[in-house]
Design a protein with these regions (language model features):
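Membrane-interface extramembranous regions at the lipid-water interface
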Residues: 3-59, 66-145, 161-189
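Extracellular/periplasmic helix-loop-helix junctions in multi-pass membrane proteins
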Residues: 146-159
Length: 189
């Protein structure tokens, strides 16, 4: 077997040997709790909405923080799954996948880059373009915009919508039978 990126043995990918997928319902729950708490706070304190840089109360801050941390746990888990696919060399380590989310500005590019690398695997497994990484990247970008301009909870829900699409594509790719070894995955562009 060749060690170059994109090589996969003819053996079947057995999902039970891979780490479990992230539990996205937890992220949805945190996001919805955050949105509800934010709307309740805004209705009880309407003057806070008029401030130029409103500072959230501690309970809202903690919900935002926990949601963001859980999002990073999910990103780490996706890349850990990809790292452990037999014969597949995933170019992004789990730590790097999480770390680049902290680089202001670069994280916007990163929200398009890492789904593209996962899409290469998914599309290679199907032998055709099935996963569109631009869709995931746009959902992540919309989530950032929602988070900063409207409501952090709704932004978090949008992040997990993108993750649901990504999970669905990965699950379908892992459910396929074995494929013969090909030289490179198809382009996602």
């Amino acid at each position: 077997m060749d060690d170059s990126p994109g090589e996969l043995a003819t053996e079947d990918i057995q999902p039970e040997k891979l780490p479990p997928f992230p539990q996205l319902w937890i992220g949805y729950l945190i996001g919805l709790a955050n949105a509800v708490a934010g709307f309740v706070y805004a209705s009880l304190h309407p003057q806070a909405a008029k401030e130029e840089f409103p500072i959230p109360p501690l309970y809202l801050f903690l919900l935002i923080f926990v949601g963001w941390v859980y999002w990073l746990v999910c990103v780490y888990r996706y890349h850990e799954i990809m790292r452990r696919v037999p014969g597949w060399k995933h170019p992004i380590s789990p730590a790097r996948a999480v770390g680049f989310h902290f680089l202001l500005g670069y994280n916007l590019y990163w929200s398009f880059k890492w789904p593209r690398e996962i899409a290469k695997f998914v599309n290679w497994r199907f032998g055709k373009i099935v996963m569109k990484p631009e869709m995931v990247g746009l959902m992540f970008l919309a989530a950032y915009v929602l988070h900063f301009l409207f409501d952090p909870g709704l932004g978090l829900v949008m992040l997990f919508l993108g993750a649901s699409y990504l999970s669905g594509c990965l699950r379908r790719a892992f459910a396929l039978g074995p494929l013969p070894t090909l030289s490179t995955p198809p382009s996602t562009e």
